[in-house]
Amino acid sequence: SSVYDVLEEKFIENGDYEKLPGNQQTLRNYIHYLEDSGQINREPEHRRIYDYVFDTPPGEQMLIDFGEETLSKTSHIHFICLLLRYSRFLCVYAQDHKYNSEEACKAIYHSFCRLGGRPKELVIDQDAVFVASETYGEVIKTRVFEDFCTEQDIRLWVCNKADPESKGPIENSVGFVKKNFFSARKVTCIDDVWRSLPGWLERKNQRIHRSTLRVPRAVYDSVEKSAMRPLLPSVYETSPNTF
């Protein structure tokens, strides 16, 4: 699907979308033919584990995790994935350096603005961007993140280091971005990502999710959107909304 997505992107850019030959299944059949005939190598299949369908009420949880894509020895793309657990609607933001607490809070708030509401709870791991320390199960948030959670009146669930049931969907999303977005594109700088990422996200949120077998955008619009809490003002409200 990553290869077909790039083809879609190119045909859309050129204004020739109607001339795009075949569909995803056509391309998939052709790739299988090339693999079976030995013209290209078949990649080993990595089955995804720990992803559950509608395991929380709509509007309840947003899962957050970070990813990194290496372009060269000195160049890296850092991205943050924000996933609504119920609908599997995905938001992704990227930049050319590691996220700090303020930048992460800005990305979270921008995802709220894009969705038109905020969930009741954020699910994170013990990343230093969010968590300053943990002692005997007591989590001490970074000052910036503590202020943001208070400002947005939002609960926090910090996953244990080995908690695949809770982290599975968002870890799968990080892997999906790396495999489906980055692997099929020649990315040389952050501008390449900013140029292609919004359109890619729009298309992916309107396709059937492999775990839920439903379309994230449709589930969000028809069910989850009405369960989201209203937006609140934020100190990040006027921050530049870049990818």
PLM features: residue spans?
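Two-metal-ion acidic nuclease core segments, chiefly of the RNase H-like superfamily
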Residues: E138-L156
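Short, basic/hydrophobic alpha-helical segments
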Residues: E102-V123
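RNase H-like two-metal-ion nuclease catalytic core shared by retroviral integrases
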Residues: I124, T135, L156-K178, V193
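Acidic/histidine-rich, metal-coordinating catalytic segments
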Residues: G117-G137
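DNA-recognition alpha helix
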Residues: S2-E18
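Active-site-proximal acidic segments at structured loop/helix or strand boundaries
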Residues: V174-F243
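Mobile-element integrase/transposase regions
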Residues: Q25, N29-C91, Y99-A107, T150, ...
